[in-house]
Amino acid sequence: MKSRPLHIAMYPWLAMGHQTAFLHLCNKLAIRGHKISFITPPKAQAKLEPFNLHPNSITFVTINVPHVEGLPPDAQTTADVTYPLQPQIMTAMDLTKDDIETLLTGLKPDLVFYDFTHWMPALAKRLGIKAVHYCTASSVMVGYTLTPSRFHQGTDLMESDLMEPPEGYPDSSIKLQTHEARTFAAKRKDTFGSNVLFYDRQFIALNEADLLAYRTCREIEGPYMDYIGKQFNKPVVATGPVILDPPTLDLEEKFSTWLGGFEPGSVVYCCFGSECTLRPNQFLELVLGLELTGMPFLAAVKAPLGFETVESAMPEGFQERVKGRGFVYGGWVQQQLILAHPSVGCFITHCGSGSLSEALVNKCQLVLLPNVGDQILNARMMGTNLEVGVEVEKGDEDGMYTKESVCKAVSIVMDCENETSKRVRANHARIRELLLNKDLESSYVDSFCMRLQEIVEGI
């Protein structure tokens, strides 16, 4: 089959972790001669532009996000709202459906990549466009929670059922704690935008796709992908690790100067992504745990619920006690550049798939502190299956961590003489070497492009 350049439209969920993940794949596809139309709102475009390494092949197409009652003015992505308001962002995204149809009719792409817009496959089919579900979450999570064997158990699934993986799941060691299973069970009854149940939205998006794609490699997630393929009776492909090319900008001076004042590998960096807003007690235990380590730390976290700024949420006397070695910042940061900084030796991560992919190719050690959803199962895979990080201990019933448990996990990974640390470091080094193998990545992207050609040609 003779290959030809494809025209691919992209419309990811309006969260920066999803947006950047899609764009990083675009960069890999553009190198191979494919044309990309990346549909995104203006605020997201401004943040994404430095990461567009092929502007002649990747074009941003502006979509205006309509206002929905309850959202702040000009809210365009989840970064503009607190976690409880994310369903309204989803509703706003659903309201762009007619505009998306108009855009796709004019653009005439061969394929459209999507994730949360469950209406996209039907729309694409009507326009003669192939629909690719590109999942930024791990196949570990999808296999555990969203496959037909689990989905058809319905909304009355018990917590005890969810504490164990579904029948046929490839890894019996990956399980949920009581508080996590309770949250997952409740989530099955939650709507997420436009009065659509969250799990209905995700299941339809997966079940009606022409192709299911995951940002991973089979060496890490192969058994989970095979399980999903059998469950949905659909082709499931890996795009490869999609290693991030360095952004075209330098690290902001305030961060590079601050980090430059410490020894190599000595700084603890903590970031929970653009979507996570901690409860006040979680925020307090986190920052007090960082203080307790006695190590220099940079924490990029949003102000907790009920607070306007991170400064106003600090415990009394905290800033004075950590002056010179502690930096708590409430805004968006250039995480990829921070993780690559030689002073950073540890990364406390919420285990979002994007953050993990950035972390695994760097040398910093991983402390796993998941918050919601797929992050929890990502943490189990990283901590229990791959053993490349140490998860912060939480109460089984309440899911609460303490300053001591935060400090303990950091202290373990930062102590190169600790037996757990030695094992984690060795496993991380092995995975890092695998992911940084350019031949591996290139072969995956080439194979993925060939699969896209076959889907378009109907093979």
UniProtKB/Swiss-Prot annotation:
State the UniProt keywords alphabetically.
Glycosyltransferase, Transferase
Q: In which tissues is it expressed?
A: Expressed in leaves.
Signal peptide start and end residues: none
EC number(s) recorded for this UniProt protein:
2.4.1.239
Output the CDD domains linked to this UniProt entry: GT1_Gtf-like
GO MF entries: flavonol-3-O-glucoside glucosyltransferase activity; UDP-glucosyltransferase activity
EC primary class: transferase
Q: What positions does the entry give for an anthocyanidin binding?
A: 18, 373
Pfam families attached to this UniProt entry = UDPGT
Q: Which reaction does it catalyse?
A: a flavonol 3-O-beta-D-glucoside + UDP-alpha-D-glucose = a flavonol 3-O-beta-D-glucosyl-(1->2)-beta-D-glucoside + UDP + H(+)
The active site annotation covers: 18, 115
Which positions are annotated as binding UDP-alpha-D-glucose? 136, 333, 335, 350, 355, 358, 374-375
Q: Which family does it belong to?
A: Belongs to the UDP-glycosyltransferase family.
Q: What does this protein do?
A: Flavonol 3-O-glucoside/galactoside (1->2) glucosyltransferase converting kaempferol 3-O-glucoside to kaempferol 3-O-sophoroside. Has a broad in vitro activity for kaempferol/ quercetin 3-O-glucoside/galactoside derivatives, but cannot glucosylate kaempferol 3-O-rhamnosyl-(1->4)-[rhamnosyl-(1->6)- glucoside] and 3-O-rhamnosyl-(1->4)-[glucosyl-(1->6)-glucoside]. Has a higher preference for UDP-glucose than UDP-galactose, and no activity with UDP-arabinose and UDP-glucuronic acid. Represents probably a recessive allele of the gene.
Fill in the misc note.
Flavonol glycosides (FGs) having glucose at the 2''-position of glucose or galactose that is bound to the 3-position of kaempferol are present in cv. Nezumisaya and absent in cv. Harosoy, whereas FGs having glucose at the 6''-position of glucose or galactose that is bound to the 3-position of kaempferol are present in cv. Harosoy and absent in cv. Nezumisaya.
Instruction: Spell out the protein name for this chain.
Output: UDP-glycosyltransferase 79B30
Recorded source organism is: Glycine max (Soybean)
